[in-house]
Design a protein with these regions (language model features):
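Preference for solvent-exposed, low-hydrophobicity sequence contexts
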Residues: 50-55, 59-247
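Phosphate-binding/switch loop-helix module in NTP-utilizing enzymes
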Residues: 1-44, 123
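Nuclease catalytic cores that cleave nucleic-acid phosphodiester bonds
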Residues: 30-33, 37-39, 47-61
Length: 247
């Protein structure tokens, strides 16, 4: 998120914007949330940070950031949203940006970021047989990347890396990542055009034999690159998984 926001800021300034305001939402609970706010302020090289209605947060950020930090009181009337309402609104926004069309993209002809299937195909029958005997599911594809291998298994459940043990680990010769075909459906992605603009997309399916991906997306122009995210949406566009490689 920090990288994407910084990129958007740079683009806006490059197109002549006098200033850029970034609304980071008001949810700041716990250390990771604090670090995220700080990283974002640093990532966009913020001249000023405005804290609304939270003196404790204001004091913390003032000690942590080189930016000018300002405090303003909360408005007398404000909307307070619970977890369920936030979830519903997020789902509605996903629908608004993703519904409207489908398309296929050949993953052989574009750059791929954030996906195991973008690695170099790696054939090792001993490794494949050893893994299949351990997890009880067919191995669809093995790819190699610097320092490890990624194993794509034909399973609806998410197979965990710790399930790959013993001889299979030794044959892999490094880090082992495991992706299940069932986890791929519903992964958020971005289709990048020739100008570097990222268009929202939702992965519907991947044919691993032809390396063709089907996406829900409004974008129908030329695709130069596909960036796979680490968020998986369910049928009602609710977030089911966050923070792990899913493709």
């Amino acid at each position: 998120i920090v990288t994407a926001v910084a990129s958007l800021r740079a683009r806006a300034r490059g197109e002549g914007a006098a200033f850029v305001a970034v609304d980071t939402d008001g949810w700041v609970k716990g250390w990771s949330a604090l670090e995220y706010k700080i990283d974002l302020a640093r990532g966009v090289n913020a001249d000023a940070v405005v804290v609304v209605g939270d003196p404790e947060l204001y004091g913390f950020l003032e000690k942590s950031l080189e930016s000018n930090v300002y405090y303003v009181r909360s408005p007398s009337v404000q909307a307070v949203r619970g977890v369920d309402e936030r979830r519903r609104l997020r789902s509605e926004n996903y629908i608004r940006f993703l519904e409207g069309g489908t398309r296929e993209v050949s993953l052989k002809s574009v750059k791929i970021q954030g996906a195991c299937i973008g690695g170099t195909p790696f054939e090792d029958e001993r490794l494949k047989a050893s893994i299949e005997s351990q997890i009880g599911s067919p191995v669809k594809l093995i790819t190699r990347y610097p320092g490890g291998v990624c194993i794509i298994v034909d399973s609806e459940r998410q197979v965990e890396p710790h399930e790959i043990k013993g001889a299979a680990r030794k044959l892999a010769g490094g880090e082992v990542l495991v992706v299940s075909t069932g986890s791929m459906k519903g992964v958020l992605a971005a289709l990048v055009d020739a100008d570097g603009v990222e268009h929202p997309a939702l992965l519907v399916d991947v044919d691993l034999d032809t390396m063709t991906a089907t996406f829900k997306t409004r974008f129908q122009g030329e695709v130069r690159k596909v960036i796979f995210g680490r968020v998986k949406l369910g049928e009602e566009y609710h977030e089911e998984i966050r923070g792990r490689i899913l493709v």
